[in-house]
């Protein structure tokens, strides 16, 4: 009888040991490195991503001089990180009443985007780009109503873009010369995220 009690105790101990070993091995499987979800790589340009509220100044450059034409508040520029060294810049439409002695009373442009703008992430993210894109402009002559003037599409408008993003601040200068316009139009944006 003692022998049966001894064997029963031995069987119970072996069962408990096996069960705890099984639980321990299941627990190891759940936390092993083979089951971890890989972390996504964070792009160096990701810190610049976001929406910046800016003031847009509009001017025209001619004969080495710059003449201010107008400005618009609360222009939202959206910046998206594309790669470690490129971003996209999305510019909203604008509609600016012009000031000064100029033969036009209003300037407007539909929204547009610049893709693959190369960035130099060096503490201050500096960027520059020269492209040709389709732009849609409206220039209202001084003696006409804005609603009577259609927008015109210019398929290969040369655009020059340069600027910086530092911390939560952005500064962008865009120069565009649509169609047969004799002088380039310059937009200066300054704002914060």
What are the residue ranges of the model-derived segments?
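Bacterial Sec-dependent N-terminal signal peptides
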Residues: 2-6, 18-51, 176-193
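Intrinsically disordered, low-complexity, compositionally biased regions/tails
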Residues: 22-25, 54, 61, 68, ...
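Extracytoplasmic electrostatic interaction patches
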Residues: 131, 135-193
